[in-house]
């Protein structure tokens, strides 16, 4: 199978996948050369997820430029399809003045029907302009090259529930101290949990448990070891806790978590079946641009 047929097959597979997950459909334009400088760049327009254009780099042309805009806080990656015959093909991200930001020659999914190159792009302000430059590399100057450019969201979300080992024991507040008494500490190590994407950051976190005997005036208390600070649950509950933690705190999910609880009752108690519920966000740049489900 020659490279043109493989390219068409690869595009067909990508389009089928895009159709199954698609938002509103749009015609995918084809750009057949002439866009070899930033001033002649093909304008893709504003970023939307999975926005694509098909590119043809004609014989005798060495590069192809595309222009697009992103808004503040949008984090995307530009995906450029590849063929094994395209030796030293590269893709570059450039700023609005055509200065190089990053460049990639690394072929991802090289053994599949849809190998690609990727560069990351982070929007800092609304309507920010970037250029993508596709370079021929060592491929025969007398032959055309076929590829696709796709703009994709990098930030995705997930969630999971994980169980602490053991029981937390509270000796009881026999002195009736106003501040109550903290229990023993139990731990949960998520450092190597394969269900959690690399680089995942906590978006929301909560705990569930069973206290025996059930008491009032109980607060769950949680500590991510990388932070080293204890977070006390927002409200009193013997069975659950939610915390003032968000993605702005930039707390990694994959680490050791510690748990204890505070009780004001005078009698001894234990807390069992302690579970950590985590919602997270993650960047596909940390997972070779693959979703973790």
Q: What is each of the regions a protein language model found here?
A:
Residues 99-112, 164-169, 217-219, 226-242:
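Solvent-exposed serine/threonine-rich low-complexity stretches and specific carbohydrate-binding patches
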Residues 183-217:
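Beta-rich globular "head" domains
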Residues 25-64, 72-74, 152-185, 289-293:
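Non-catalytic extracellular/lumenal accessory regions of secreted precursors
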Residues 57-118, 125-128, 135-136, 197-198, ...:
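Acidic, Ser/Thr/Pro-rich low-complexity intrinsically disordered segments
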Residues 2-27:
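Sec-dependent N-terminal signal peptides of Gram-positive bacterial secreted proteins and lipoproteins
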Residues 120-140, 248-268:
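Noncatalytic modules at the cell exterior or secretory-pathway interfaces
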Residues 109-125, 236-253:
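Beta-sandwich interaction modules
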Residues 66, 136-153, 266-282:
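Edge beta-strands of jelly-roll/beta-sandwich modules across compartments, strongly enriched
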